[in-house]
Amino acid sequence: MIVGVAYAKPTVQVWKHVDVPEGTSAREAIERSGLLAQFPEIDLEVNKVGIFGAICPLDRTLAEGDRVEIYRPIHPEAELLEKKR
């Protein structure tokens, strides 16, 4: 089955389609996507993940067409940084 795995930084957005077997977890899809190697700052013990904008545990079983999103931690000064842009 095909699922998406997405990660975004302020300057780069990546969305990969990954072919995974039935019963694959969010963690397994992220690992298969190659994003952990591409973005070494991703720490699955720190970064939250979700499916279509809803936070979920890493062991959540995926369905065909799900989009797994890896969220960056909120920076305490994010609001100030946004105003500077």
Swiss-Prot record:
It comes from the Bacteria. Transmembrane segments: none annotated. Signal peptide: none annotated. InterPro entries: Mopterin_synth/thiamin_S_b, RnfH, RnfH_sf. Gene3D superfamilies: RnfH-like. HAMAP family: UPF0125_RnfH. Belongs to the UPF0125 (RnfH) family. This is Protein RnfH.
